[in-house]
Amino acid sequence: MSDLVKSSEVIETTEVPPHNNNNNKRHFKYDSEQRKQRLAGGVKLKDALMILCAGFALISDGYQNNVMSMMNKVFALEYPKEYTASLSTQVSNASLVGTIFGQVIIGLTADYIGRKWSIVTATCFLIFGTMMCAASHGKTVNGMFWMLTIFRGVTGFGIGAEYPSSSVTASEAANESVKRRGGAFILATNLPLSFGGPFALCIFLIVRRICGNHLDAIWRTMFAIGCFWPLSVFYFRLKMVTSELYTKSAIKQRAPYWLALKYYWPRLIGTCVAWFLYDFVTFPNGIFSAGIISNVIPKSEKNNLEKIAEWNLLLGAIALPGVFVGAYVVDILGRKYTMMIGFCGYIVFGLIVGCGYHQIKPITGLFIVFYGLMMSCGNFGPGNNMGLTSSESFATPIRGTAYGISAAIGKVGAVVGTKTFSPIQKNLGDKWTFIIAAICGLAGVLVTFIFIPHLKDEDLLEEDVKFKNYLIDNGWKGKFGIQEYDEEEDLEGSSEDSSDGEIVKNNTKNDVEKVDALK
Protein backbone atom coordinates (compact mmCIF):
# COMPACT_ATOMS: atom_id res chain seq x y z
CA MET A 1 0.00 0.00 0.00
CA SER A 2 1.11 3.54 -0.55
CA ASP A 3 2.68 5.60 2.20
CA LEU A 4 1.24 9.01 2.85
CA VAL A 5 3.44 11.89 1.84
CA LYS A 6 5.57 12.82 4.86
CA SER A 7 5.65 16.50 5.73
CA SER A 8 8.60 18.18 7.41
CA GLU A 9 6.36 19.15 10.32
CA VAL A 10 4.58 15.81 10.68
CA ILE A 11 6.11 13.76 13.47
CA GLU A 12 4.24 10.59 12.51
CA THR A 13 2.58 9.54 9.24
CA THR A 14 -0.43 7.28 9.06
CA GLU A 15 -0.42 4.27 6.71
CA VAL A 16 -3.09 1.80 5.65
CA PRO A 17 -2.18 -1.47 7.48
CA PRO A 18 -0.52 -4.09 5.22
CA HIS A 19 -3.17 -6.68 6.06
CA ASN A 20 -6.01 -4.38 4.97
CA ASN A 21 -7.45 -5.51 1.63
CA ASN A 22 -10.04 -2.77 1.30
CA ASN A 23 -8.67 -0.70 -1.58
CA ASN A 24 -11.56 1.77 -1.47
CA LYS A 25 -10.79 2.90 2.08
CA ARG A 26 -10.24 6.65 2.35
CA HIS A 27 -7.73 8.30 4.64
CA PHE A 28 -6.91 11.79 5.80
CA LYS A 29 -3.54 13.42 5.24
CA TYR A 30 -2.13 16.24 7.35
CA ASP A 31 -0.94 19.28 5.38
CA SER A 32 1.62 21.24 7.41
CA GLU A 33 1.77 24.07 4.87
CA GLN A 34 -1.72 25.14 5.83
CA ARG A 35 -0.65 25.67 9.41
CA LYS A 36 2.37 27.72 8.33
CA GLN A 37 0.04 29.98 6.38
CA ARG A 38 -2.31 30.33 9.36
CA LEU A 39 0.50 31.27 11.75
CA ALA A 40 2.08 33.64 9.23
CA GLY A 41 -1.08 35.73 9.27
CA GLY A 42 -0.66 36.57 12.96
CA VAL A 43 -3.20 36.32 15.75
CA LYS A 44 -6.74 36.87 14.52
CA LEU A 45 -9.08 39.08 16.53
CA LYS A 46 -11.80 36.41 16.74
CA ASP A 47 -9.30 33.88 18.11
CA ALA A 48 -7.96 36.36 20.68
CA LEU A 49 -11.50 37.21 21.84
CA MET A 50 -12.42 33.53 22.12
CA ILE A 51 -9.34 32.86 24.25
CA LEU A 52 -10.08 35.84 26.52
CA CYS A 53 -13.79 35.06 26.87
CA ALA A 54 -13.05 31.41 27.59
CA GLY A 55 -10.43 32.13 30.23
CA PHE A 56 -11.51 35.38 31.85
CA ALA A 57 -14.31 33.94 33.97
CA LEU A 58 -11.89 31.35 35.37
CA ILE A 59 -10.89 34.11 37.82
CA SER A 60 -14.26 33.39 39.40
CA ASP A 61 -13.40 29.68 39.56
CA GLY A 62 -10.11 30.46 41.29
CA TYR A 63 -11.97 32.85 43.58
CA GLN A 64 -14.58 30.23 44.50
CA ASN A 65 -11.94 27.55 45.02
CA ASN A 66 -10.07 29.76 47.49
CA VAL A 67 -12.83 31.76 49.19
CA MET A 68 -13.57 28.89 51.58
CA SER A 69 -10.08 29.22 53.08
CA MET A 70 -11.08 32.41 54.91
CA MET A 71 -14.78 31.57 55.15
CA ASN A 72 -13.94 28.50 57.24
CA LYS A 73 -12.25 30.81 59.72
CA VAL A 74 -15.17 33.29 59.65
CA PHE A 75 -17.75 30.55 60.24
CA ALA A 76 -15.68 29.09 63.09
CA LEU A 77 -15.69 32.49 64.82
CA GLU A 78 -19.37 33.27 64.16
CA TYR A 79 -20.72 29.80 64.93
CA PRO A 80 -18.13 28.21 67.26
CA LYS A 81 -20.51 25.49 68.53
CA GLU A 82 -22.26 24.58 65.28
CA TYR A 83 -19.37 24.84 62.81
CA THR A 84 -17.52 21.66 63.68
CA ALA A 85 -14.65 20.10 61.74
CA SER A 86 -17.05 17.68 60.02
CA LEU A 87 -19.37 20.53 58.97
CA SER A 88 -16.37 22.47 57.65
CA THR A 89 -15.39 19.47 55.53
CA GLN A 90 -19.01 19.06 54.35
CA VAL A 91 -19.29 22.65 53.11
CA SER A 92 -15.81 22.58 51.55
CA ASN A 93 -16.35 19.24 49.81
CA ALA A 94 -19.78 20.20 48.43
CA SER A 95 -18.12 22.37 45.81
CA LEU A 96 -15.64 19.64 44.91
CA VAL A 97 -18.36 17.00 44.48
CA GLY A 98 -20.36 19.37 42.28
CA THR A 99 -17.21 20.07 40.30
CA ILE A 100 -16.75 16.36 39.55
CA PHE A 101 -20.27 16.06 38.11
CA GLY A 102 -19.86 19.30 36.15
CA GLN A 103 -16.60 18.17 34.59
CA VAL A 104 -17.89 14.80 33.44
CA ILE A 105 -21.36 15.89 32.24
CA ILE A 106 -20.31 19.11 30.51
CA GLY A 107 -17.20 17.40 29.16
CA LEU A 108 -19.49 14.98 27.31
CA THR A 109 -21.85 17.70 26.10
CA ALA A 110 -18.94 19.86 24.94
CA ASP A 111 -18.20 17.15 22.37
CA TYR A 112 -21.74 16.01 21.61
CA ILE A 113 -23.75 19.28 21.70
CA GLY A 114 -21.09 21.94 21.23
CA ARG A 115 -18.49 24.15 22.86
CA LYS A 116 -20.63 27.29 22.98
CA TRP A 117 -23.63 25.59 24.61
CA SER A 118 -21.38 24.09 27.26
CA ILE A 119 -19.56 27.30 28.13
CA VAL A 120 -22.83 29.28 28.39
CA THR A 121 -24.34 26.56 30.61
CA ALA A 122 -21.29 26.70 32.86
CA THR A 123 -21.67 30.47 33.21
CA CYS A 124 -25.35 30.16 34.18
CA PHE A 125 -24.64 27.59 36.89
CA LEU A 126 -21.83 29.73 38.29
CA ILE A 127 -23.98 32.86 38.51
CA PHE A 128 -27.03 31.12 39.99
CA GLY A 129 -25.10 29.00 42.49
CA THR A 130 -23.02 31.90 43.76
CA MET A 131 -26.05 34.16 44.23
CA MET A 132 -27.88 31.48 46.21
CA CYS A 133 -24.82 30.88 48.42
CA ALA A 134 -24.89 34.55 49.37
CA ALA A 135 -28.63 34.26 50.16
CA SER A 136 -28.36 31.10 52.29
CA HIS A 137 -30.69 31.02 55.30
CA GLY A 138 -32.73 28.60 57.39
CA LYS A 139 -34.85 28.24 60.52
CA THR A 140 -31.77 26.93 62.30
CA VAL A 141 -28.05 27.43 61.83
CA ASN A 142 -27.72 23.84 60.63
CA GLY A 143 -30.51 24.47 58.13
CA MET A 144 -28.65 27.49 56.80
CA PHE A 145 -25.47 25.45 56.40
CA TRP A 146 -27.37 22.74 54.56
CA MET A 147 -28.64 25.34 52.08
CA LEU A 148 -25.11 26.67 51.74
CA THR A 149 -23.85 23.12 51.17
CA ILE A 150 -26.40 22.48 48.41
CA PHE A 151 -25.68 25.68 46.54
CA ARG A 152 -21.94 25.33 47.00
CA GLY A 153 -22.54 22.08 45.13
CA VAL A 154 -24.43 23.96 42.38
CA THR A 155 -21.59 26.47 42.20
CA GLY A 156 -19.16 23.57 42.05
CA PHE A 157 -21.08 22.14 39.09
CA GLY A 158 -20.56 25.46 37.32
CA ILE A 159 -16.88 25.47 38.24
CA GLY A 160 -16.51 21.92 36.94
CA ALA A 161 -18.36 22.81 33.75
CA GLU A 162 -15.94 25.69 33.18
CA TYR A 163 -12.91 23.40 33.10
CA PRO A 164 -13.61 21.35 29.94
CA SER A 165 -15.67 23.99 28.14
CA SER A 166 -13.35 26.96 28.74
CA SER A 167 -10.05 25.12 28.48
CA VAL A 168 -10.96 23.17 25.34
CA THR A 169 -12.33 26.32 23.69
CA ALA A 170 -9.20 28.31 24.57
CA SER A 171 -6.92 25.54 23.32
CA GLU A 172 -8.70 25.20 19.98
CA ALA A 173 -8.85 28.96 19.47
CA ALA A 174 -5.14 29.33 20.27
CA ASN A 175 -4.32 26.57 17.79
CA GLU A 176 -5.72 28.62 14.91
CA SER A 177 -3.19 31.46 14.84
CA VAL A 178 -1.05 31.60 18.02
CA LYS A 179 2.56 30.46 17.60
CA ARG A 180 3.40 29.78 21.28
CA ARG A 181 0.08 28.16 22.06
CA GLY A 182 1.13 26.62 25.38
CA GLY A 183 2.08 29.91 27.01
CA ALA A 184 -1.02 31.64 25.66
CA PHE A 185 -3.24 28.84 26.97
CA ILE A 186 -1.69 29.01 30.44
CA LEU A 187 -2.03 32.80 30.67
CA ALA A 188 -5.67 32.52 29.60
CA THR A 189 -6.63 29.64 31.92
CA ASN A 190 -4.32 28.79 34.82
CA LEU A 191 -3.30 32.40 35.47
CA PRO A 192 -6.91 33.46 36.19
CA LEU A 193 -7.39 30.32 38.29
CA SER A 194 -4.22 30.98 40.29
CA PHE A 195 -4.88 34.71 40.54
CA GLY A 196 -8.31 33.95 41.99
CA GLY A 197 -6.71 32.98 45.33
CA PRO A 198 -4.79 36.24 46.03
CA PHE A 199 -7.71 38.15 44.52
CA ALA A 200 -10.12 36.52 47.01
CA LEU A 201 -7.83 37.51 49.89
CA CYS A 202 -7.53 41.11 48.67
CA ILE A 203 -11.31 41.33 48.45
CA PHE A 204 -11.61 39.78 51.91
CA LEU A 205 -9.30 42.39 53.46
CA ILE A 206 -11.35 45.19 51.85
CA VAL A 207 -14.68 43.68 52.90
CA ARG A 208 -13.33 43.05 56.41
CA ARG A 209 -12.41 46.73 56.73
CA ILE A 210 -15.83 47.84 55.54
CA CYS A 211 -17.93 45.38 57.55
CA GLY A 212 -15.81 45.31 60.69
CA ASN A 213 -16.93 42.55 63.05
CA HIS A 214 -20.23 41.93 61.23
CA LEU A 215 -19.22 38.42 60.24
CA ASP A 216 -22.57 37.58 58.61
CA ALA A 217 -22.18 40.52 56.23
CA ILE A 218 -18.59 39.48 55.46
CA TRP A 219 -19.31 35.96 54.24
CA ARG A 220 -22.46 36.91 52.31
CA THR A 221 -20.63 39.73 50.54
CA MET A 222 -17.68 37.49 49.73
CA PHE A 223 -19.91 34.90 48.08
CA ALA A 224 -21.92 37.54 46.19
CA ILE A 225 -18.81 39.14 44.67
CA GLY A 226 -18.08 35.80 42.97
CA CYS A 227 -20.93 36.56 40.51
CA PHE A 228 -19.11 39.50 38.96
CA TRP A 229 -16.64 37.73 36.68
CA PRO A 230 -19.04 35.27 34.98
CA LEU A 231 -21.61 38.06 34.60
CA SER A 232 -19.02 40.31 32.95
CA VAL A 233 -18.35 37.84 30.12
CA PHE A 234 -21.81 36.29 29.77
CA TYR A 235 -22.84 38.46 26.79
CA PHE A 236 -19.57 37.85 24.95
CA ARG A 237 -19.85 34.11 25.48
CA LEU A 238 -23.31 34.19 23.91
CA LYS A 239 -21.71 35.74 20.81
CA MET A 240 -18.81 33.27 20.57
CA VAL A 241 -18.29 31.36 17.32
CA THR A 242 -17.45 27.68 17.03
CA SER A 243 -13.78 26.85 16.45
CA GLU A 244 -12.68 25.54 13.06
CA LEU A 245 -11.28 22.40 14.65
CA TYR A 246 -14.65 21.48 16.15
CA THR A 247 -16.48 22.36 12.93
CA LYS A 248 -14.23 20.03 10.93
CA SER A 249 -13.71 17.15 13.35
CA ALA A 250 -16.69 16.86 15.70
CA ILE A 251 -18.51 13.52 15.89
CA LYS A 252 -22.19 14.19 16.53
CA GLN A 253 -23.52 10.64 16.24
CA ARG A 254 -22.27 7.19 17.25
CA ALA A 255 -19.17 8.48 19.02
CA PRO A 256 -16.64 5.59 19.10
CA TYR A 257 -15.75 5.78 22.79
CA TRP A 258 -14.47 2.19 22.97
CA LEU A 259 -12.11 2.72 20.04
CA ALA A 260 -11.03 6.02 21.57
CA LEU A 261 -10.27 4.30 24.87
CA LYS A 262 -8.22 1.61 23.12
CA TYR A 263 -6.26 4.30 21.29
CA TYR A 264 -5.75 6.79 24.12
CA TRP A 265 -5.76 4.71 27.32
CA PRO A 266 -2.07 5.34 28.21
CA ARG A 267 -2.52 9.09 27.88
CA LEU A 268 -5.80 8.99 29.81
CA ILE A 269 -4.13 7.11 32.67
CA GLY A 270 -1.35 9.71 32.70
CA THR A 271 -3.62 12.76 32.78
CA CYS A 272 -6.03 11.21 35.33
CA VAL A 273 -3.42 9.99 37.82
CA ALA A 274 -1.18 13.06 37.54
CA TRP A 275 -4.19 15.36 38.05
CA PHE A 276 -5.33 13.25 41.03
CA LEU A 277 -1.92 13.64 42.68
CA TYR A 278 -1.76 17.38 41.99
CA ASP A 279 -5.24 18.13 43.35
CA PHE A 280 -4.68 15.79 46.32
CA VAL A 281 -1.88 18.14 47.38
CA THR A 282 -2.95 21.58 46.22
CA PHE A 283 -6.66 21.69 47.15
CA PRO A 284 -6.44 20.86 50.87
CA ASN A 285 -3.41 23.13 51.13
CA GLY A 286 -5.50 25.90 49.61
CA ILE A 287 -8.73 25.30 51.53
CA PHE A 288 -7.02 24.79 54.89
CA SER A 289 -4.14 27.24 54.36
CA ALA A 290 -5.66 29.64 56.90
CA GLY A 291 -5.66 26.86 59.48
CA ILE A 292 -2.10 25.86 58.60
CA ILE A 293 -0.94 29.46 58.98
CA SER A 294 -2.82 29.93 62.26
CA ASN A 295 -0.79 27.00 63.65
CA VAL A 296 2.54 28.73 63.00
CA ILE A 297 1.80 32.39 63.82
CA PRO A 298 2.00 33.73 67.41
CA LYS A 299 -0.86 32.69 69.71
CA SER A 300 -1.99 36.31 70.08
CA GLU A 301 -2.78 36.42 66.33
CA LYS A 302 -4.48 33.03 65.92
CA ASN A 303 -7.99 34.53 65.78
CA ASN A 304 -6.98 37.76 64.04
CA LEU A 305 -8.68 37.46 60.65
CA GLU A 306 -6.69 40.29 59.08
CA LYS A 307 -3.31 38.88 60.13
CA ILE A 308 -4.22 35.41 58.86
CA ALA A 309 -5.46 36.89 55.57
CA GLU A 310 -2.27 38.95 55.17
CA TRP A 311 -0.04 35.91 55.66
CA ASN A 312 -2.30 33.95 53.31
CA LEU A 313 -1.98 36.73 50.73
CA LEU A 314 1.81 36.56 50.99
CA LEU A 315 1.59 32.80 50.47
CA GLY A 316 -0.49 33.32 47.32
CA ALA A 317 1.82 36.05 46.05
CA ILE A 318 4.85 33.74 46.35
CA ALA A 319 3.00 30.94 44.57
CA LEU A 320 1.81 33.09 41.64
CA PRO A 321 5.17 33.67 39.81
CA GLY A 322 5.34 29.94 39.11
CA VAL A 323 2.52 30.44 36.60
CA PHE A 324 4.49 33.05 34.61
CA VAL A 325 7.77 31.14 34.64
CA GLY A 326 5.99 27.95 33.61
CA ALA A 327 4.15 29.76 30.80
CA TYR A 328 7.48 31.05 29.47
CA VAL A 329 9.32 27.71 29.40
CA VAL A 330 6.49 25.33 28.50
CA ASP A 331 6.91 25.74 24.73
CA ILE A 332 10.69 25.40 25.10
CA LEU A 333 10.94 22.39 27.42
CA GLY A 334 7.65 20.81 26.45
CA ARG A 335 4.67 19.91 28.63
CA LYS A 336 6.09 16.64 29.94
CA TYR A 337 9.40 17.92 31.30
CA THR A 338 7.86 21.11 32.72
CA MET A 339 5.43 18.94 34.68
CA MET A 340 8.22 16.72 35.95
CA ILE A 341 10.21 19.73 37.19
CA GLY A 342 7.13 21.01 39.03
CA PHE A 343 6.55 17.67 40.74
CA CYS A 344 10.23 17.63 41.72
CA GLY A 345 9.58 20.94 43.50
CA TYR A 346 7.00 19.14 45.65
CA ILE A 347 9.66 16.61 46.60
CA VAL A 348 12.30 19.22 47.48
CA PHE A 349 10.22 21.77 49.40
CA GLY A 350 7.83 19.18 50.85
CA LEU A 351 10.77 17.40 52.46
CA ILE A 352 12.40 20.67 53.58
CA VAL A 353 9.25 21.86 55.38
CA GLY A 354 8.19 18.40 56.56
CA CYS A 355 11.53 17.19 57.89
CA GLY A 356 12.46 20.56 59.36
CA TYR A 357 8.95 21.50 60.48
CA HIS A 358 9.69 22.08 64.17
CA GLN A 359 12.81 24.11 63.35
CA ILE A 360 11.09 26.25 60.68
CA LYS A 361 7.72 26.69 62.45
CA PRO A 362 8.87 29.40 64.93
CA ILE A 363 10.13 31.54 62.01
CA THR A 364 6.79 32.42 60.40
CA GLY A 365 8.25 34.31 57.45
CA LEU A 366 10.61 31.47 56.51
CA PHE A 367 7.81 28.92 56.84
CA ILE A 368 5.57 30.96 54.50
CA VAL A 369 8.40 31.34 51.95
CA PHE A 370 9.11 27.59 51.76
CA TYR A 371 5.39 26.80 51.77
CA GLY A 372 4.84 29.34 48.98
CA LEU A 373 7.73 27.96 46.92
CA MET A 374 6.22 24.49 47.13
CA MET A 375 2.90 25.85 45.86
CA SER A 376 4.73 27.87 43.19
CA CYS A 377 6.35 24.67 41.89
CA GLY A 378 2.86 23.19 41.69
CA ASN A 379 1.74 26.13 39.55
CA PHE A 380 4.89 25.93 37.41
CA GLY A 381 4.47 22.24 36.60
CA PRO A 382 1.21 20.31 36.96
CA GLY A 383 -0.91 23.37 37.71
CA ASN A 384 -0.05 24.93 34.36
CA ASN A 385 0.19 21.74 32.37
CA MET A 386 -2.60 19.44 33.50
CA GLY A 387 -5.23 21.42 31.60
CA LEU A 388 -2.87 22.06 28.70
CA THR A 389 -1.82 18.42 28.37
CA SER A 390 -5.38 17.15 28.76
CA SER A 391 -6.59 19.45 25.99
CA GLU A 392 -3.73 18.59 23.60
CA SER A 393 -3.31 14.84 24.14
CA PHE A 394 -6.66 13.88 22.64
CA ALA A 395 -8.34 14.46 19.28
CA THR A 396 -11.10 17.05 18.86
CA PRO A 397 -14.04 14.56 18.70
CA ILE A 398 -13.34 13.35 22.26
CA ARG A 399 -11.28 16.25 23.65
CA GLY A 400 -14.01 17.59 25.94
CA THR A 401 -14.90 14.13 27.25
CA ALA A 402 -11.30 13.09 27.93
CA TYR A 403 -10.53 16.46 29.50
CA GLY A 404 -13.63 16.26 31.70
CA ILE A 405 -12.79 12.73 32.88
CA SER A 406 -9.18 13.70 33.66
CA ALA A 407 -10.23 16.81 35.56
CA ALA A 408 -12.95 14.89 37.42
CA ILE A 409 -10.45 12.28 38.61
CA GLY A 410 -8.31 15.21 39.72
CA LYS A 411 -11.19 16.53 41.80
CA VAL A 412 -11.66 13.08 43.32
CA GLY A 413 -8.10 13.56 44.50
CA ALA A 414 -9.10 16.95 45.90
CA VAL A 415 -12.03 15.39 47.80
CA VAL A 416 -9.83 12.60 49.17
CA GLY A 417 -7.13 15.10 50.13
CA THR A 418 -9.61 17.43 51.83
CA LYS A 419 -11.26 14.53 53.67
CA THR A 420 -7.96 13.09 54.91
CA PHE A 421 -6.13 16.36 55.63
CA SER A 422 -7.46 16.88 59.16
CA PRO A 423 -7.06 13.20 60.20
CA ILE A 424 -3.46 13.28 58.94
CA GLN A 425 -2.76 16.40 60.99
CA LYS A 426 -4.46 14.94 64.06
CA ASN A 427 -2.99 11.42 63.97
CA LEU A 428 0.42 11.90 62.34
CA GLY A 429 1.19 15.56 63.01
CA ASP A 430 1.31 18.75 60.92
CA LYS A 431 4.64 17.92 59.30
CA TRP A 432 3.26 14.83 57.61
CA THR A 433 1.00 16.91 55.35
CA PHE A 434 4.19 18.19 53.71
CA ILE A 435 5.99 14.83 53.69
CA ILE A 436 2.98 13.25 51.96
CA ALA A 437 3.08 16.11 49.44
CA ALA A 438 6.68 15.11 48.68
CA ILE A 439 5.63 11.47 48.23
CA CYS A 440 2.90 12.59 45.81
CA GLY A 441 5.53 14.62 43.97
CA LEU A 442 7.66 11.51 43.47
CA ALA A 443 4.65 9.55 42.23
CA GLY A 444 3.81 12.45 39.89
CA VAL A 445 7.29 12.39 38.36
CA LEU A 446 7.02 8.65 37.65
CA VAL A 447 3.49 8.85 36.20
CA THR A 448 4.39 11.82 34.00
CA PHE A 449 7.56 10.15 32.72
CA ILE A 450 5.77 6.90 31.83
CA PHE A 451 2.38 8.02 30.53
CA ILE A 452 2.41 11.71 29.51
CA PRO A 453 3.42 12.32 25.86
CA HIS A 454 6.20 14.78 25.02
CA LEU A 455 4.26 17.66 23.46
CA LYS A 456 5.53 21.10 22.53
CA ASP A 457 3.51 23.11 20.04
CA GLU A 458 2.19 20.55 17.58
CA ASP A 459 -0.85 21.38 15.49
CA LEU A 460 -3.96 19.92 17.10
CA LEU A 461 -5.27 19.15 13.62
CA GLU A 462 -2.42 16.67 13.16
CA GLU A 463 -3.70 14.63 16.12
CA ASP A 464 -7.19 14.78 14.61
CA VAL A 465 -5.89 13.33 11.33
CA LYS A 466 -4.17 10.43 13.12
CA PHE A 467 -7.29 9.65 15.15
CA LYS A 468 -9.59 9.80 12.11
CA ASN A 469 -7.37 7.39 10.19
CA TYR A 470 -7.30 5.05 13.20
CA LEU A 471 -11.11 5.02 13.30
CA ILE A 472 -11.31 4.35 9.55
CA ASP A 473 -8.80 1.49 9.82
CA ASN A 474 -10.95 -0.06 12.56
CA GLY A 475 -14.12 0.01 10.50
CA TRP A 476 -15.89 3.01 12.01
CA LYS A 477 -18.49 4.34 9.54
CA GLY A 478 -19.55 7.66 11.07
CA LYS A 479 -19.17 11.22 9.83
CA PHE A 480 -16.78 13.96 10.93
CA GLY A 481 -17.65 17.61 11.32
CA ILE A 482 -20.79 19.58 12.05
CA GLN A 483 -21.92 19.63 8.41
CA GLU A 484 -22.75 16.36 6.72
CA TYR A 485 -20.60 15.91 3.65
CA ASP A 486 -21.79 14.16 0.54
CA GLU A 487 -19.32 11.39 -0.18
CA GLU A 488 -19.57 11.78 -3.96
CA GLU A 489 -18.77 15.48 -3.69
CA ASP A 490 -15.88 14.70 -1.36
CA LEU A 491 -14.36 12.29 -3.86
CA GLU A 492 -14.77 14.78 -6.69
CA GLY A 493 -13.29 17.73 -4.78
CA SER A 494 -10.04 19.23 -6.01
CA SER A 495 -6.82 19.39 -4.01
CA GLU A 496 -6.54 23.09 -4.82
CA ASP A 497 -9.55 23.78 -2.58
CA SER A 498 -8.29 21.66 0.32
CA SER A 499 -7.96 23.07 3.79
CA ASP A 500 -5.77 21.74 6.60
CA GLY A 501 -6.44 18.05 5.98
CA GLU A 502 -6.96 15.91 2.90
CA ILE A 503 -8.50 12.53 2.19
CA VAL A 504 -6.24 10.00 0.52
CA LYS A 505 -7.77 7.14 -1.46
CA ASN A 506 -5.55 4.09 -1.95
CA ASN A 507 -6.25 2.20 -5.21
CA THR A 508 -4.94 -1.09 -6.54
CA LYS A 509 -2.10 0.62 -8.40
CA ASN A 510 -0.81 2.14 -5.15
CA ASP A 511 -1.49 5.65 -6.45
CA VAL A 512 -2.39 8.42 -4.04
CA GLU A 513 -5.35 10.57 -5.00
CA LYS A 514 -5.79 13.74 -2.93
CA VAL A 515 -9.28 15.08 -2.53
CA ASP A 516 -10.82 17.71 -0.36
CA ALA A 517 -12.45 16.53 2.86
CA LEU A 518 -12.44 19.48 5.23
CA LYS A 519 -14.03 22.60 3.85
Swiss-Prot record:
Recorded GO MF terms: glycerol-3-phosphate transmembrane transporter activity; glycerophosphodiester transmembrane transporter activity; transmembrane transporter activity
Transmembrane helix found in the keyword field: yes
Major localization listed first in the record, in broad terms: membrane
Compositionally skewed regions (Acidic residues) per UniProt: 487-500
Residues the record marks as carrying a glycan: 93, 175, 506
Compartment(s) of residence: Cell membrane
Pfam families hit by this protein: Sugar_tr
Catalytic activity, reaction form: sn-glycero-3-phospho-1D-myo-inositol(out) = sn-glycero-3-phospho-1D-myo-inositol(in)
Disruption phenotype: Abolished the utilization of glycerophosphoinositol(GroPIns) as a phosphate source.
Membrane topology: Multi-pass membrane protein
Entry annotated with the keyword Cell membrane: yes
Region (Disordered): 1-32, 487-519
Highest rank taxon of the organism: Eukaryota
PROSITE patterns given in the database record: MFS, SUGAR_TRANSPORT_1
Gene Ontology biological-process entries: glycerophosphodiester transmembrane transport; transmembrane transport
Regions annotated as coiled coil: none
Residue spans crossing the bilayer: 39-59, 94-114, 117-137, 141-161, 186-206, 216-236, 273-293, 313-333, 337-357, 363-383, 404-424, 432-452
GO-annotated cellular components: membrane; plasma membrane
Composition bias type Basic and acidic residues, residue spans: 508-519
PANTHER family from the UniProt entry: CARBOXYLIC ACID TRANSPORTER PROTEIN HOMOLOG
Family: Belongs to the major facilitator superfamily. Sugar transporter (TC 2.A.1.1) family.
Role noted for this protein: Glycerophosphodiester transporter that mediates uptake of glycerophosphoinositol (GroPIns) as a source of inositol and phosphate. Does not possess detectable glycerophosphocholine (GroPCho) transport activity. Although no glycerophosphoinositol transport activity occurs in the absence of GIT1, C.albicans is still able to use glycerophosphoinositol as a phosphate source at pH 7.5, albeit slowly. Thus, a second, GIT1-independent, mechanism must exist for utilizing glycerophosphoinositol as a phosphate source at physiological pH.
Protein name per Swiss-Prot or TrEMBL: Glycerophosphoinositol permease 1
The organism of origin for this protein: Candida albicans (strain SC5314 / ATCC MYA-2876)
Primary gene name: GIT1
